[in-house]
From Swiss-Prot:
UniProt keyword Ribosomal protein present: yes
Disulfide pattern: none
Keyword Cytoplasm assigned: yes
Protein name, per record: Large ribosomal subunit protein uL3y
A cellular component annotation (GO) from this entry: nucleus
Organism listed in the record: Arabidopsis thaliana (Mouse-ear cress)
Main location group: cytoplasm
Example of a GO biological process term: translation
InterPro entries: L3_arc_euk, Ribosomal_L3_dom_3_arc_sf, Ribosomal_uL3, Ribosomal_uL3_CS, Transl_B-barrel_sf
């Protein structure tokens, strides 16, 4: 930037360094919403699988705006969220160096899809994970030991989290057999109530509508789509050099002065792009779809056409959404089938956008495999008429 007579911000943010591959495939919750002991006990996060995107039409509720009561078309993401199963509870104590886990109590019966998570190769293993621990629940001595650990949690711990896993076998579009295991913090009530609440959920299914509601703002944590090794122009957005540049033009011309005799970390360099851990905040829930209810279909108050939320031909590279789902405004991190962590928002929402009530008029169910024209197969058959097989 020598001899430049105007201000120019640098290309690319340094706030996301280092730009390297994420250490884990599943999004990690690094902060939970602030606890309020006066409220009843509740869970604060959930796991889902990204299915794909579609678009909706709705009326804007914004009094005073020119757009008030006008139709708008918006992109939405469908995240399939089958019920999670609670299998354990963890207690944390506060130390000068942060939270430290005191003890963990597991449920008696753990499914095979969860036990697969503790093996690198399930087929060649002895499949004995938790067999000794589950016998604790059958003997008097073991029950006393478990009860003493729970009492220790009530006495010393300040944070209680449950261990819950996804039901991966219900995800027919995924070939994976290992369930994803996650810690979910319990907020509300005192510590004793939290421990009792966690124990009451052991081996039970927790649906997504027990945590998130329609029109709520949530955060999405996940790992972005991987791009591999990329150059500086794609990775950092720096300007291409002139056409006649010697030895390449999609480069940084000068990577630093002679002294200091090293390359600064702030200089744009080629390297890994994508597969980064990211948190997207304030995504509005447009619909919570429940299996067996009208909300699972793409029907609305204005559009009574009987059609499923899955577009014609299924979501590309995913398939059919058969379980509960969340409809989120806008896009979300990761490719299709990627597991994403859904978390309640950290801050109290007061903006007009967050408080707006969403009334969907139309949900598109046309094929995503091209320029889809038809919402249902019956509509397509009616348009083309009777087909004659050769």
């Amino acid at each position: 930037m020598s001899h430049r007579k105007f201000e120019h911000p640098r290309h690319g943010s340094l706030g996301f360094l280092p730009r390297k591959r994420a250490s884990r495939h599943r999004g990690k919750v690094k902060a939970f919403p602030k606890d309020d002991p006066t409220k009843p006990c509740r869970l604060t996060s959930f796991l889902g699988y990204k299915a794909g995107m579609t678009h909706i039409v709705r009326d804007v509720e914004k009094p005073g705006s020119k757009l008030h009561k006008k139709e708008t078309c918006e992109a939405v993401t469908i995240i399939e969220t089958p019920p999670m199963v609670v299998v354990g509870v963890v207690g944390y104590v506060k130390t000068p160096r942060g939270l430290r886990s005191l003890c963990t109590v597991w449920a008696q019966h753990l499914s095979e899809e969860l036990r697969r998570r503790f093996y690198k190769n399930w087929a060649k293993s002895k499949k004995k994970a938790f067999t000794r621990y589950s016998k604790k629940h059958e003997t008097e001595e073991g029950k006393k030991d478990i009860q003493s650990q729970l009492e220790k949690m009530k006495k010393y711990c300040s944070v209680i989290r449950v261990l819950a896993h996804t039901q991966i076998r219900k995800m027919k579009g995924l070939k994976q057999k290992k369930a994803h295991l996650n810690e979910i913090q319990i907020n509300g009530g005192d510590i004793a109530k939290k421990v009792d609440y966690a124990c009451s959920l052991f081996e039970k299914q927790v649906p997504v509508d027990a945590i998130f509601q329609k029109d709520e703002m949530i955060d999405i944590i996940g790992v972005t789509k991987g791009k591999g090794y990329e150059g500086v122009v794609t990775r950092w957005g720096v300007t291409r050099l002139p056409r006649k540049t010697h030895r390449g033009l999609r480069k940084v011309a000068c990577i630093g002065a002679w002294h200091p005799a090293r390359v600064s970390y702030t200089v744009a360099r080629a390297g890994q792009n994508g597969y980064h851990h990211r948190t997207e905040m304030n995504k509005k829930v447009y619909r919570v779809g429940k299996v067996g209810q009208e909300t699972h279909s793409a029907m609305t108050e204005y559009d009574r056409t009987e059609k499923d939320i899955t577009p014609m031909g299924g979501f590309p590279h995913y398939g059919i959404v058969k379980e509960d789902y969340l409809m989120i405004k806008g896009c979300c991190v990761g490719p299709k089938k990627r597991v994403v962590t859904l978390r309640q928002t950290l801050l109290k929402q007061t903006s007009r956008l967050a408080m707006e009530e969403i009334k969907l008029k139309f949900i598109d169910a046309a094929s995503n495999g091209g320029h889809g024209r038809f919402q249902t197969s019956q509509e397509k058959a009616k348009f083309y008429g009777r087909t004659i097989k050769a």
